A protein has these predicted regions:
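Membrane-anchoring hydrophobic helices of lipid-metabolizing enzymes
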Residues: 2-128, 133, 162-167, 173, ...
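Residue-level detector of anion-binding/catalytic polar loops
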Residues: 148, 175, 195, 232-234, ...
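Catalytic machinery of carbohydrate-active enzymes
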Residues: 51-54, 71, 85-87, 116, ...
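Catalytic core of membrane glycerolipid acyltransferases/transacylases, capturing the structured
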Residues: 122-180, 203-209, 216, 361
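Non-catalytic C-terminal accessory region of glycerolipid acyltransferases
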Residues: 2-4, 8-11, 75-78, 118-119, ...
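Generic beta-sheet signal
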Residues: 122-128, 149, 194-198, 233, ...
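Short clusters of hydrophobic/aromatic residues that line enzyme substrate/ligand-binding pockets
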Residues: 108, 176, 211-213, 292, ...
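Membrane-interfacial amphipathic helices and adjacent loop/beta segments
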Residues: 85-108, 150-180, 354-383
Length: 488
């Protein structure tokens, strides 16, 4: 038993639990259709008041459906807020009711086909999406024929609520397995021919494999694929889709890629199934989760354990747009070229744009890893520069140390702003680079300042870079002065 469940419940736990139980009791007195409609009204209120969550949902919908008009995006977000609360409230109520009442609200049209696909399965791994009323996942033992059932879940901070969730699911024959305790019990269920379910469509952090979801790389849990391969389990993917007020349909399909398919291939295919399910009813998915979360500090992906997997049939990736503010002097710009090249090669979807003084624009266009160059004309102030780059980039990386460079990207509202801590500009940045350690008896070479940035954000510093093509065919003699007033 975990340490958490050995702890005593606090007064706050008791108060929250009392409110939850009271609300559940009052809702249980109402018809489920009324609860659904009332939940939609509460959800609309949340849409109006919860501006940060509305922005997050809007951003996610725009990533998934970049061709949608703004009005279509907003309609999807509004409907999502409404149906999300409606489904959650109905899930609370139906979770307390007997199966003979609950099944009146479920469409079983596809269950027969699912049963045929899994009849001879040794065991089953069910990859569940946050679609519709996912709380009805606990009903699996009532319509699937397996000796045991388990679900991997994240424990509640409130000890009393956590115990209530466990008891409610066990009442239906579903064992709740806290994922922080490991998967020994889940593996045991599979070994005994059971079914193990888990939610699969959330950001998996550093432990996930980066595969496309709607054409944009997303960290995705490979756990369902790993368990299915090791246990020789049949893999199902799906959820409980909303098809009307207080009405849901079971949609689970067999994922058959063959025994030879790799973990990465299976994980990628799971994301494709998630896409297909979302496209059937876009407002039904959980858009309030930061599914395409940018990792920190290593938002370049070359050094992650599981790395990136791109299926051979995948569409072109949506670009991960990186703005790099170049130094203003030619010598400094030359010394930063290697860092720019390594940053570009840090992830397959990287699109690098250099923000430079106009006098350096032609120089940066000769670097093959640079996709675009934006020039800063003489006399342009920070507000004018910010207008040029506003809403166009996910990341801004600052090579110069001046406060103005921080102000430019802050005014442009670029989400991630990266650079060294320097006087008068720390307020404008939200990711800081540690100073490089001195190399040997003298101070580090100035190029190391830029390479340290690339290293800290996840670039591969060991990769051999291809040679840059010659700019001109005729031989020339170039003289370099390897020094500066402030260092080598």
């Amino acid at each position: 038993m975990s340490k958490r469940r050995n702890e005593r419940a606090t007064i706050g736990d008791h108060l929250v639990y009392a409110v939850y139980r009271s609300a559940s009791f009052l809702l249980s007195l109402l018809p489920v259709a009324w609860i659904f409609r009332g939940g939609q009204a509460v959800g609309f209120l949340g849409y109006v008041l919860l501006l940060p969550y509305r922005r997050l949902a809007r951003r996610n919908v725009q990533i998934a459906f970049p061709d949608w008009a703004p009005a279509q995006v907003e309609r999807c977000v509004r409907t999502h807020f409404q149906n999300l609360v409606a489904n959650l409230l109905c899930g609370f109520v139906l979770g307390e009711r007997p199966w003979k009442e609950v099944k009146r609200f479920i469409d079983f049209t596809t269950v027969g086909e699912t049963a045929e696909e899994t009849a001879d399965a040794r065991c089953i791994v069910a990859a569940v999406t946050h679609v519709g009323n996912w709380e009805l996942l606990s009903t699996l033992p009532h319509w699937m024929d397996r000796p045991e059932f388990g679900v991997v879940y994240q424990k509640q901070r409130n000890r009393l609520l956590d115990e209530h969730v466990r008891k409610s699911r066990s009442r239906d024959g579903m064992e709740a397995i806290d994922r922080s305790e490991g998967l020994t019990r889940g593996v045991g269920i599979l070994k005994r021919g059971g079914l193990l379910a888990m939610l699969v469509d959330q950001h998996a952090g550093d432990k996930g494999v980066w595969v496309p979801l709607f054409g944009r790389l997303a960290s995705t849990s490979s756990l369902p694929a790993i368990l299915a391969k090791r246990a020789h389990a049949r893999l199902l993917a799906g959820g409980m889709e909303t098809i009307g007020p207080a009405k849901w349909r079971i949609e689970y399909r067999y994922l058959n890629l063959g025994e030879s398919a790799s973990v990465e291939e299976v994980t990628s295919e799971l994301n494709r199934r998630v896409e297909a399910q979302i496209k059937r009813n876009p407002p039904d998915w959980f858009w309030l989760h930061n599914r395409w979360k940018m990792p920190s500090p290593r938002f370049l992906l070359r050094t992650y354990k599981r790395g990136v997997y791109l299926p051979s049939t995948s569409e072109p990736l949506q670009p991960f747009r990186i703005l790099i503010r170049s130094s203003n002097w030619l010598g400094d710009a030359v010394m930063s070229v290697e860092a720019v090249r390594r940053i570009k090669r840090g992830r397959p979807d990287a699109q690098v744009t250099m923000l430079v003084r106009s006098k350096l624009a032609e120089f940066w266009r000769t670097v093959p890893e640079v996709d675009d160059v934006i020039g800063i004309e003489n006399g342009e102030n920070a507000w004018q520069v910010a207008r040029k780059i506003r809403t166009r980039f996910e990341v801004a990386i600052l090579f110069p140390n001046s406060p103005r460079t921080g102000l430019e990207v802050w005014l442009a509202r670029i989400p991630r702003r990266v650079g060294y801590r320097r006087p008068w500009r720390n307020f404008f940045l939200n990711q800081f680079i540690p100073e490089p350690k001195d190399l040997g008896p003298i101070s580090h070479h100035h190029a190391q300042i830029y390479l340290q940035i690339a290293r800290h954000i996840g670039a591969d510093m060991e990769e051999a870079l291809p040679a840059i093509p010659r700019i001109a065919a005729e031989p020339r003699t170039v003289g370099l002065c390897p020094g500066a007033e402030y260092g080598p």
